[in-house]
């Protein structure tokens, strides 16, 4: 199993904790509102909204909350207007970071970002400083026991499959072309294969392998960033070395 897959496993474990944070629904509501504003309130004709609703429902968000967020996006209800801004920078050990935000106050957000980065051995960079290292892809997590790698390949071969990575819990992370995420989800559903956390992801061309001490520092920084209500997603090119996983689990 690659170090990147190990990091995916850690992120999956972290998600259970993240869901206890008060900011989870805030982030989901923002994404639904923005998606509805950009592409309309009908999920059948708005793939981004459809994906946002699926994510919200998988995290047990009540339908009333989802509908209110949609109506705020379409203007049927009064709501806050959000700007989507992407920041780039570096974390400990030279790890590249892309930070996607949705904010109603740009000055507050960038001040918070600088504060978090400076306290955690990170720094913001210029636009384009690290984005060239990443490509946007579709990503689907398939939990352990849902399917074998061979079954996934058979089901997804004609649905935009680009890569399958295993994790320590027997599950898989499926990577697709950015335009084929919906097709891959549909193929899994038709095959009766359970999946979770289907999303658009930013995958780096190359990874930097870290030992446990540096990996802890990067994870601490990412935790701090993800704890901010204005930050929707954080992507990095961190890979965890083969010998570091046990230390990180301690």
Swiss-Prot record:
Record has Cytoplasm as a keyword: yes
InterPro entries attached to this UniProt entry: Integrase-like_N, TACO1_YebC-like_2nd/3rd_dom, TACO1_YebC_N, Transcrip_reg_TACO1-like, Transcrip_reg_TACO1-like_dom3, YebC-like
Organism of this sequence: Chlorobium phaeovibrioides (strain DSM 265 / 1930)
GO molecular function ontology, one term from the record: DNA binding
Family label: Belongs to the TACO1 family.
Full protein name: Probable transcriptional regulatory protein Cvib_1432
HAMAP family in UniProt: Transcrip_reg_TACO1
GO (cellular component) term, any one: cytosol
């Amino acid at each position: 199993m690659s170090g990147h897959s190990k990091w995916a496993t850690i992120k999956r474990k972290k998600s259970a904790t993240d869901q206890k944070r008060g900011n989870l629904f805030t982030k989901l509501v923002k994404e639904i509102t923005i998606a509805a504003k950009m592409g309309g309130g009908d999920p059948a004709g708005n793939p981004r909204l459809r994906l946002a609703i699926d994510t919200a429902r998988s995290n047990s968000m009540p339908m009333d909350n989802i509908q209110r967020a949609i109506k705020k996006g379409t203007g049927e209800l009064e709501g806050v207007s959000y700007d989507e801004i992407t920041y780039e920078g570096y974390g400990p050990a030279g790890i590249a970071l892309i930070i996607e935000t949705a904010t109603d106050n740009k000055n507050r957000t960038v001040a918070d970002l600088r504060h978090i980065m400076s306290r955690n051995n990170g720094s913001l960079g210029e636009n384009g400083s690290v984005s060239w290292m990443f490509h946007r892809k579709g990503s689907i997590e398939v939990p352990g026991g849902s399917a074998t790698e061979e079954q996934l390949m058979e089901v997804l071969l004609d649905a935009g499959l680009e890569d399958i990575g295993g994790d320590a819990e027997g599950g898989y992370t499926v990577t697709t072309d950015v335009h084929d995420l919906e097709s891959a989800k549909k193929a899994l559903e038709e095959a009766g294969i359970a999946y979770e956390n289907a999303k658009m992801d930013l995958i780096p061309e190359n990874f930097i392998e870290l030992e446990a001490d540096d990996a802890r520092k990067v994870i601490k920084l990412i935790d701090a960033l993800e704890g901010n209500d204005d930050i929707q997603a954080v992507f990095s090119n961190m890979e965890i070395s083969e010998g570091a996983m046990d230390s990180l689990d301690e």
